[in-house]
Structures are given as C-alpha cells and as structure tokens.
Amino acid sequence: MTSDFYSRANGMRDKLLGARKEGLDSMEYEDALGSVLWELYDLIGRPVIKRFDVLHVPEQSRVWWCPTSVLCSLPLHAMGPIRSDGRVGLYFSDLYIPSYTPTLSALIEARKPGTQIFEEPSTLLVAQPDAEIPGALQEMLVVQANSPSVTTLVGNKATPTAVMEHLRDHRFVHISCHGELEIGKPFDASFKLHRGSRLTLLDIVRSQLPDAEFAFLAACHTAELTEESIADEGLHLTGAVQYCGFRSVVGTMWAMADIDGPDLAGSFYRTVFADRWEGVPYYERTAEALRDAVRSLRRKRNMRLERWVNFVHYGA
C-alpha cells in the first residue's frame, strides 16, 4: 500500500469507529458508513472492476477478498454505489458474489477437492435466546422450517459437551448466541452457551471434524475487528471458524438487528436447499445464497445500510 492509500484506509476506519460511538442505529453512523462505502469504491472498487474488464472476468463471478491490516475492518464486499452500463444504485455485491478469506492458505484448504457429498446435509441448530437476542427463537423456527433435517439444542440442552457430540454427526451448524473474541488469542474465542458455559474454538479444533462444511454464526460481532484487534490480521471469530475446518462460514460485522435474523435465515436456507443447484455441493451454494438473501433484505422499505452491510461470507 502507498502512503496515501494507507492514510485513506486509516481515515475510513477511524470515521467508522468514531461514528459507532453514537450507536449503530444513529444517523451519524449511517452517514459515515455511506461515505466509507463510496470511498472504498473510489479507492479500491473502481480500479479492481476496471481490471476485471481487462481480464474478461464476467459479472456474477465469485470474488474473494484477502485483506490485511486496516483493510480487515472495512466492508469491501459492499462498496458503492456503482454506476455501470447506465445502471445506477448498484453495489459491488450486485455485480459479483463476494467472499473473504483470512489467508490464501485457508481458502486453498477450503476449496481443496475432497469426497463430494451431494446428499442433503443435516443441520445442527444451537440457540441460546436471552433478553439481548429475543429473535433467536423465531430464527430457530425459520431454520427448522427451511432445512430438510435439523437437530436442535436450545436452552439447557445447549451445553459445550452436547454441542461437541452432535457436531461430529452434522455437516452444517447454525449458532444463534453470543460470540466473544479474545484479542491476541483467537482460538480462545468462544460461544456463550447454557448458564454462561463456553464453547471455544480450541475445543472445535481438537475435536477434528472431517465432515464439517458450513457454519452460520448468527452471534454478535462474529466478524468485527476493532482498533485493538487490527494487529491480529483479520483472524476474528468468523475467520477462525474457517480455520477449524469448516469450508464456508457466514458471520456478521457487528450486532445484528433482531428483526433481520429470521428473514435473512429463511431466505438463505430456502436458496441453499433449492432444486436449481444440480451437481453443486451444498457448502458451495452458501456465498450466492447469502448474497441473494442480503439483496432481498436491502429491498425492504427504509432499510438502513448498517443492517444489510453487516453480513459477510468466508471460505469456499
């Protein structure tokens, strides 16, 4: 990065962190986020898309971002709005299907050919509703209604021991609870389960899950990087779960609006399990399914930027 590039990237990060102190639902944050999305497009998106044109990369291609340093904290997947071929009001995710990866080696591992399983995966659903995430129960019902086979661990059944036992038998997992990242110790990051018990990423790594394919982390702040965590080069909870062996992971950049969880989950799983994907492994459907679900969310009346920019995909 040139000094000017680095200075502008730092300025965008500082603008978002400063506005966030006013609250994610404040007009200050909404204005700051809109300004940052446009500047990201001007700084990164415009030259990248021009290069895609030179290389004849077609629209709707998969694109993986592997950011470092301060760029790890910025929403590259949602740059815009973009004017393209007379079309206005488009964002990067309208033109391409964006994903992230914490490192190139993690992406190579996630996309490594293996035994392709085309039968419908069973989903482990882990939910820990409380006063801060009351929508977890409705989200749970939506996941159950739109997935072919679901095992549910909720409330007092959601213990670390129970989750680890069931993870071995499921290729998909949907976790709707609080997540916490330990700065400088990514594998001490954890999900808060029954009575404050914690399932750490180190527990998952040690369990060795050869069939793990996809994790949906509907927990708070699973992909968020703060000023203090920038030095960790983007290894936050979402990226760390990919390191645990899951080929694809969906997370959030900040606290999710409670009303968005059920709608987005329903749209997402309906797309993943639709009939149109002949010959495509289920975990490889998740990036496009998330992109389409977010676009549907974006079309809602009075939809704020921070609500739809929030969702990110990592991995294959």
What function would you assign to each model-found segment?
Residues 261-316:
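An often Trp-containing, charged/polar helix-loop segment at the C-terminal end
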Residues 66-70, 127-131, 155-157, 177-178:
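Structural motif
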Residues 153-162, 197-200:
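Short acidic loop-to-helix transition motifs that present clustered carboxylates
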Residues 98-110, 129-133, 171-278, 282:
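Catalytic cores of nucleophile-dependent amide-cleaving enzymes
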